[in-house]
A protein has these predicted regions:
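Exoplasmic/lumenal beta-rich domain surfaces
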Residues: 257, 476-549, 615, 622-647
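Fold-level signature of zinc-dependent metallopeptidase catalytic domains
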Residues: 26-33, 37, 164-324
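N-terminal prosegments of processed precursors
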Residues: 23-158
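Ser/Thr-rich, Proline-interspersed low-complexity disordered segments
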Residues: 684-716
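Extracellular acidic, Ser/Thr/Pro-rich low-complexity tracts
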Residues: 466-471, 483, 561, 607-614
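Short, solvent-exposed loop/turn segments at the edges of extracellular beta-sandwich modules
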Residues: 560-567, 666-670
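The catalytic-center signature of Zn2+-dependent metalloproteases
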Residues: 259-289, 329-410, 480, 484-496
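Proline/serine/threonine-rich low-complexity linkers at boundaries of modular beta-sandwich domains
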Residues: 429-446, 576-584
Length: 717
């Protein structure tokens, strides 16, 4: 009996141990994050970040600690074979799964001084195109998730609260950038004549290039973000650089580690290197003068850190805007970078400003083509003005160009022109002379563009690319216009039109998508605006307009494999030549809310407008039907009809109130869609209730309701 009892007890212990282990493993899934009612939170707490829309969640910190304790170190066998999994809360109420690993952004010497500062890198499971960087700091948990659906951010609900959090879309973040100014000036690089502009292929991802970052902080910055302490300010710097690294790793395979003695250049009150406690009066920086701080930073970093001990230098402040010197890392001017903002927190500070100013240091110029407000004053770069208005990528000026703003904040990608410049500097320029390279095992995707085409003016068109990836990574596509203002002379009118005869860029970039097709202009403007996008959407420039003149537009597609640890990218180029004497090619019927019957013939008409003649030579068209308002066109009504302006087609046996017709050139990329929904409804009349009373017997006819009347309704044998 004792032996049996002992065996049962041992078995029970093993069972309980296994159950406990299983519970611990499942806790991050079930209990790490819980939605919470904001009304239960402290309404008087000081908040740094208040988006217009957000979800509040509560973090189980003990469960998070369990999850983080299972994280393997990056670039280890364990990271490949036994990745840890974490769930992150999304703004829409869902939870998203990620594989994650520990990924330090501090050199070991600094990490040893601040062991509670932990940073991680993650790759999406539910959405493999999503990558993330998150941290666990004394100030709480912070995350950035980069995905085609949009950037998601997770931040503490309030200062000092490490339990309650907000998760929100970047597009819903408040605009905190109105006081910022970047004082970088175009170094007046030699320009190419418009006909000589070329688009070299850009590839990256086989090597992760790691650089040592000396990141100084003025006393004013440490007071603003870190309670005037070195630890508090460094935590804020780690948060910012973790997010910056997330973008640089995915787009450029560049990683920056904060140097071992960075605490010595963080000029908080408990840093005693200023002849005592550091203050705004005795630290080595002129906080509100960015240009002056460029030289001060070089002197300070070389003296305190040593020129041989860092590869790129930068300083954070609360004034002076942003300014940097082109092509700095590994060179003598490597410390010449400044980012200053009165409220130096949040994603806008990290991406719109720090990533932007460091982008200059890595070799990228401004990419906006606007000329008013901050886009004026010599800030526009003649050699790289590839985006309408303020632009919207990292090296543009989203949110600070007044009437020419494209959006309140940038999207978290670099324009292909910026990719070219940074890849060239870091891979084959001076920036390649001091990098620590790590083989990633990643092979960039191979992307194929559609080729070159000739189209009529004022007519929608689509470009489609395809890509393969030998590693099986999930690919996204980003079609961008690659045209400078003619001769780089600057804008002479609203910067997203060519109707004045100037062949400037007229299509803005968007967040990369999972599909390889981009339609110009975006489909809503075709369906709702008769192919003419409004000049503004809300308070911002629309940034899309069909060409109105003879010109050749160049487009590049960037294929990304979205590897979180070192993204692979590749590009392809297509030229679209516009014939100003032809077009618009346009559907003319059905263009009203008509109603047609299924299985009947309908005459589709369109304006040919010179599209059959050389050099367009579109002899035939394809005619398709949509039943969902023009979003998809699965039904082909005519695969190859003569491009003569009219074709009788058979309406299929379907019913809908949201039908549209699409007529597209066979062997070309241009098309048009009918302007208005029309209906396909059956013409067979449906019996109406008004016929019922005629069959109802009158009171005097009651006997006719007896069973003797039943046989009249019975079918004969």
């Amino acid at each position: 009996m004792k032996r049996i009892a002992l065996r049962i007890t041992a078995t029970l212990i093993l069972f309980l141990a296994a159950a406990t282990f299983g519970l611990a493993a499942s806790q991050p899934i079930e209990t790490m994050w819980q939605s919470t009612d904001e009304r239960s939170l402290d309404s008087g707490a000081k908040r740094w970040i208040v988006p217009s829309v957000y979800r509040t969640v509560r973090l189980n910190r003990a469960t998070l600690a369990q999850a983080l304790g299972r994280a393997p170190m990056e670039f280890t066998r364990e990271a490949t074979e036994k990745p840890a999994i974490i769930y992150l809360p999304m703004p829409d109420g869902k939870m998203a799964r990620f594989r994650f690993e520990e990924s330090p952004i501090m050199e070991p010497g600094l990490a040893a001084k601040f062991p509670s500062f932990k940073t991680y890198r993650a790759q999406g499971i539910d959405d493999p195109t999503a990558s993330s960087r998150f941290d666990w700091l004394p100030t709480g948990f912070h995350a950035i998730i980069l995905a085609p659906s949009g950037t998601v951010l997770i931040d503490p609900y309030a200062q000092g609260n490490t339990t309650d959090y907000i998760t929100y879309w970047k597009r819903d973040a408040a605009n905190t950038t109105s006081g910022f100014k970047c004082d970088f000036k175009d170094p007046e690089l030699p320009e190419l004549p418009q006909g000589d502009i070329h688009a070299p292929a850009v590839t990256s991802g086989t090597q992760l290039r790691t650089y040592r970052l000396a990141l100084a902080a003025t006393n004013e910055y440490t007071v603003a973000v870190g309670s005037n302490t070195v630890a508090g300010a460094l935590a804020a710097e780690v948060l910012i650089m973790n997010r910056v690294n997330g973008v640089y790793e995915r787009d450029l395979a560049i990683h920056m580690n904060i140097v071992a003695n960075n605490n010595l250049i963080t000029y908080a009150g408990d840093n005693l290197s200023c002849g005592g406690a550091c203050t705004a009066a005795n630290d080595p920086y002129t906080n509100n003068n960015g240009s002056t701080m460029l030289g001060q930073n070089t002197t300070t970093l070389n003296s305190v850190i040593g020129s041989a001990n860092y590869d790129i230098g930068h300083v954070f402040s609360t004034g002076g805007g942003g300014v940097a010197t082109l092509n700095g890392p590994c060179a003598g001017n490597k410390a010449r970078g400044v980012t200053g903002l009165s409220n130096p927190v949040g994603d806008a500070f990290a991406i719109d400003y720090v990533a932007h100013e460091m982008g200059h240091q890595w070799g990228a110029n401004h990419t906006f083509n606007g000329t008013v407000s901050n886009c004026g004053g010599g800030n526009r770069s003649n050699s790289s003005a590839y985006e309408p208005g303020s632009g919207i990528t990292i090296m543009a000026y989203a949110g600070i160009c007044g009437s020419q703003d494209m959006a309140a904040h940038s999207i978290d990608t670099f324009h292909v022109k910026s990719l070219e410049a940074i890849v060239a500097y870091s891979q084959s320029g001076t920036g390649n002379t001091c990098a620590g390279n790590t083989a990633t095992g990643n092979t960039p995707p191979v992307v194929t563009g559609p080729g070159n085409f000739t189209i009529p003016k004022g007519t929608p068109f689509s470009l489609t690319a395809s890509a393969t990836d030998v590693n099986g990574d999930a690919i996204t596509y980003d079609w961008e216009e690659y045209d400078l203002d003619a001769g780089g002379a600057g804008t002479t009118a609203v910067p997203n039109t060519d109707s004045d005869g100037t062949a400037r860029p007229i299509f803005r970039p968007y967040v990369p998508t999972v599909g390889g097709t981009r339609t110009f202009p975006s489909l809503p403007y075709i369906l709702n605006n008769a192919n003419v996008p409004p000049a503004t959407t809300g308070i911002f420039l629309t940034g899309e307009l069909l060409p109105a003149i003879s010109r050749t537009m160049t487009f590049q597609v960037v294929a990304r494999d979205n590897r979180a640890n070192a993204g692979g990218i590749n590009t392809a180029t297509s030229a679209v030549t516009v014939v100003g004497a032809a077009g618009p090619f346009a559907v003319t019927a059905p263009n009203t809310a008509v109603s047609v019957s299924p299985l009947t013939n309908f005459n589709v008409t369109w304006n040919v407008n010179g599209t059959t003649a050389a050099p367009i030579n579109a002899a035939n068209v394809k005619i398709s039907l949509s039943t969902d308002g023009g979003n998809t066109f699965p039904t082909v009504l005519a695969a190859s009809a003569p491009n003569d302006g009219a074709e009788s087609v058979l309406i299929p046996n379907v019913e809908t109130t949201t039908a549209r017709i699409k007529v597209e050139a066979v062997g070309n990329i241009f098309f048009d869609i009918s302007d208005t929904d029309f209906s396909i409804t059956s013409s067979t009349p449906t019996p109406t209730p008004t016929a019922t009373p005629t069959a109802t017997p009158t009171p005097t006819a009651t006997p006719t309701a007896t069973p003797t009347a039943t046989p009249t309704a019975t079918p004969t044998p």
